[in-house]
Amino acid sequence: MIAPGDIAPRRDSEHELYVAVLSNALHRAADTGRVITCPFIPGRVPEDLLAMVVAVEQPNGTLLPELVQWLHVAALGAPLGNAGVAALREAASVVTALLC
């Protein structure tokens, strides 16, 4: 089962795209069939290139939480790793800042 913070490839694209799951455990337990995600870019993006990015240590990459998206869980492949609690919290605070 996919978990909060998991980084997974998208199976619904012919391109190599990755997302991080932002949905919390309560949302996942509701079993809606969908998850809230944001793009994950392998490697580092220069901080001055984009606003509101979140660095991830392992796997090394960058979250783009301002580009939040809802996806069906079937669109996600097996997780490659997990962004971790700190990165997930930072991404959630970016999403909250966009809405409030």
Curated annotation (Swiss-Prot):
This is Toxin Rv0299. Keywords: Toxin-antitoxin system. Toxic component of a type II toxin-antitoxin (TA) system. Upon expression in M.smegmatis inhibits colony formation. Its toxic effect is neutralized by coexpression with cognate antitoxin Rv0298/MT0312. GO terms for biological process: negative regulation of growth. The lineage of its organism: Bacteria, Bacillati, Actinomycetota, Actinomycetes, Mycobacteriales. It comes from Mycobacterium tuberculosis (strain ATCC 25618 / H37Rv). It comes from the Bacteria.
